[in-house]
Structure formats: structure tokens, C-alpha cells
A protein has these predicted regions:
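Extended, low-polarity transmembrane helix blocks
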Residues: 1-45, 60-71, 75, 82-209
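Perimembrane loop-to-helix junctions flanking transmembrane segments
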Residues: 47-61
Length: 209
């Protein structure tokens, strides 16, 4: 009885199974488009940063890689928004996230913002000495600003924090893109779905030989 009710419930809910995929796309699209736009707007600086070994990533073929990263994020973000070729565009975006994780963020641990109370920094799960030292540095910075700066104005847009720049965002985006890679843009809510539906309808109308 319960098993049948459970099956019937989720059978009815399956008509809306495209909504989570739509929400993933709507979440990711502006992030990717903005990242691609920023790269395109300062492309020469991005190329320098990709190739420079002193202050950048020291990657080979920086012009090619910068172009590919920019195109993947800018074009891929637009395609995600539309639900067009969702599985295909997820691939270069996942590669871009992996490159960012392993060339920029991995040495900083997991957290994007230094939070010494996090289990991902205090040794409960992971240990990050830099994050654990952040509260003392933040306290010193606040003290200086309270003494010599307009502290109320400086914090009127939000509290001061220490940026850790770990892999948190990159890994999260990668997982979201991985879901889209396996499940596509979503039923009823993507161009992919309607294009495939039209193709199936067309094939179904062809005479059998």
C-alpha cells in the first residue's frame, strides 16, 4: 500500500522533474556569462596572467587557453540559459572549473571565505593553518580601521572578512555542471527538450519500409 502510494506520488511529480535542472541552469548561467565577460573585457591582461610564471599561472599557449576559457564561459553560459546543447556545453565548462581548481585554488584548501569555526578548516575534517590564523589578522585589521578609518562607512555594505579563495565555488559549480551533463537541460524547460521532441515526432511520422 505505502509502496504503491510512494510510486504514484513520484510518478505524478515526475512531470516537474525539469524544474531542478532549470534552476541549476538559471543559477549557473549568470555566473558563467559574467566570468566570460570579465575575461573578454580585459583579454590581454588575462593572457598575461595565464602565461606569466612570476605572478600568474605559467600555462603554455596562454593566448589559446585564455580564448578557450573565455569562449567556454561566455558562450556556454548563454547556451545554459537557453537550455541549448546543455550536455555538450557542460563539458568545456567542467574542464574550465577543474583548471581553475587545480591551478588557482587547490593550495588554499576548501573554503572561499576564511572561517576558523568551520569543520573544513579546524581539523575536524580538514586542517587549514591559514584559515585558523585569519581571526587574529581580521581582528588587527578591524582595530586599525576603527582607530584610523571611518569604520561605520567601511562596513555599511557588510562585515569585513578574510578571503581564503579555496576550491569551494569551483567544486560546487563543477558538481552542478556534472548534473546537467548527465541529465540535460530539463523536460519542458529547455530548447534541447523541444528540439528532441520535434525530431522524434518527425521520425515517427516517416513511413516504415
Amino acid at each position: 500500500m505505502i509502496k504503491q502510494l510512494y510510486a504514484n506520488l513520484f510518478k505524478k511529480l515526475s512531470v516537474a522533474d525539469g524544474i531542478p535542472l532549470l534552476l541549476l541552469r538559471l543559477y549557473l548561467a549568470p555566473v558563467m556569462i559574467q566570468a566570460g565577460w570579465n575575461k573578454a573585457s580585459s583579454f590581454s591582461s588575462i593572457v598575461d596572467w595565464f602565461g606569466n610564471e612570476d605572478y600568474g599561472l605559467g600555462l603554455p599557449f596562454p593566448l589559446v587557453l585564455a580564448f578557450l576559457a573565455t569562449a567556454a564561459e561566455l558562450v556556454g553560459g548563454i547556451f545554459l540559459l537557453l537550455g541549448l546543447l546543455t550536455r555538450l556545453v557542460a563539458i568545456p565548462l567542467m574542464v574550465t572549473m577543474l583548471v581553475a581548481i587545480f591551478t588557482v585554488h587547490i593550495d588554499n584548501g576548501w573554503l572561499a571565505i576564511a572561517d576558523a569555526s568551520s569543520w573544513l578548516a579546524d581539523g575536524t575534517i580538514l586542517m587549514n593553518d591559514s584559515v585558523m590564523a585569519a581571526p587574529e589578522k581580521l581582528s588587527a585589521a578591524k582595530s586599525l580601521l576603527q582607530t584610523y578609518g571611518n569604520y561605520d562607512w567601511l562596513t555599511s555594505s557588510g562585515s569585513l572578512v578574510v578571503l581564503n579563495n579555496g576550491i569551494e565555488f569551483g567544486a560546487t559549480y563543477f558538481v552542478m555542471l556534472l548534473v546537467l551533463f548527465f541529465y540535460g537541460g530539463g523536460r519542458y524547460v529547455s530548447i534541447d527538450y523541444f528540439a528532441l521532441s520535434c525530431e522524434i515526432t518527425t521520425l515517427g511520422s516517416l513511413p516504415l519500409k
